[in-house]
């Protein structure tokens, strides 16, 4: 006998197939006059009709990544409350945090996220998202799949979602990298190669790759020339570096596409280093009162940096709590206490980011 899940999968496939075969009015929308006209017309094949895409409603995307995976019943999907106690049998564990009200009637989340609860009316809560079973050994496999849409391993490097957005939409501000990755160290990590596998532009070329800033409070150091270096010397170094790239293995044996992409990425970096917009990376310029609202750790500072970069014209920013095996949200040990600490780190900064974007008129386009 098929299981409930098998039945739902079959029903979903059948429904999608039926929708895909519907009249041409779907191409332009149910209520679109042109779509209705096309639907009523018997002339012309469906293959000749132009797809009408919805208009973009956002300029910037900020992805806040809870690396390691927060437990849904302890955060945004509370179940029956069971107070935590040492030695609690696993079969009795439902939600060890009580449910609290939010700004939306009949929507509750778990205690410890009080600030986020007050801004829930600015967003959409999805509790039905399901991922494929890629094995339980490495979180990196699931992170790779979520960020790229591909199941690892791949014979070619698959682009990160940020690289797709950078490639398709391009930069909003020519001086600000289109894809900025905040908070994740790729070295000194037990799964560094797995992480590197999807923190990449893949087959799009290096110019669309992430501008990595593992430590938000040091971001400004990555976008300004070394102290004391004159503009003339900086320009001379840049020219010399381009010559060295030509003599490198990439320059000697890489394809023309790879070489040109590398040179364009260098040009982008040079443009940023000489731009006044680089001050957006300097958290020391943030007023103390504002900075303190975000200063819960690297993630909170990353949220502040994301807001400043959004104001400066960034296209895609990912801020992560950082994935390290068995640390942070990867709560294999002392799970309840660790979840308490992680909520303290993310609750205020996430809520403040939403409020700040709203106050600046940016929330509707972010």
Regions picked out by a protein language model, each given a short descriptive name:
Residues 1-366:
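Ligand-binding pockets and gating/stacking loops
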